[in-house]
Amino acid sequence: SIGAHADKKIGIDGEDATTGVTSAVEMLRAIGDDEMPDYTGKRVVVIGGGNVAMDVARSSVRLGADKVSIVYRRRKADMTALPEEVEGAEAEGCDVLELMSPVRIEKDENDAAVGLWVQPQMISRIKGGRPSPKTAAKDEVLIPCDLIVVAIGQGIETRYFEEHGVTVKRGTIEALDTSEIKERKGIFAGGDCVTGPATVIRAIAAGKVAAANIDEYLGYHHEITSDVEIPYAGYEDKVPCGRVEVALRDAADRKKDFEPIEYGFSCEEACQESGRCLRCDHFGFGSFRGGREKQW
């Protein structure tokens, strides 16, 4: 359970430029370590359409970038980023260049990136639930820039595992439904290193599956019980209320710093919003209908 902390390469000519090309993982890690890069006056191009790409773009604005462009090969409507993230990026001055597929990186005589060539796209057949892009009959476009940030996803470090005989397929470790690694008896894997980057809840679920099967592999059959009594949850005195939306700081102010962009709830709003809880832990919901289990 090692997560996915390595960057993914886009695989185009010029990506190996000595300066002017970096990854979202590298950039955001530096910010997290309080080693803020200086983008003052720079033109930044971000490649990608997910939440991480929006984080990179909005962070670039806060680091002083003069212009930030987000390049995505599909439509803006097809972006995997949350709509509020895309709206927030645009409100803070980022340009979204949709239907533009990166082709190669332009470099100068010093091997520094000075621009990104993109090929205009058009929407084609629907595959996997969303329209696929295809090359449009238009000329390539050069986007001049000082820095290109690749934000197309994360991967895992597999080399050391492969060297020790662990089966790796398409960048992830192959594991059985029991979480045991194929042909490696007694070794288990789960989370992002098996599924690829996913949600926290999927990683937690994988951990629970692995724990149960490791327990059985070791010859035990432990059972976990809960003696916590959950108080009755009644709705007799509850008045139905609408959702309280969180207020945002003005884009012109929030883009100047890394402080929270939301104001948060007032005491009154917090009390009202918490009163809307459906108490799924008590009653259960959907496939979990029936409430909390006493033993598992």
Region roles according to the model:
Residues 15-24, 30, 81-108, 115-121, ...:
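N-terminal glycine-rich dinucleotide-binding loop that anchors FAD/FMN and/or NAD(P) in oxidoreductases
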Residues 17-41, 126-197, 238:
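FAD-site-proximal beta/loop scaffold in flavoenzymes
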Residues 56, 190-224:
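A conserved FAD-binding loop/helix module that cradles the flavin
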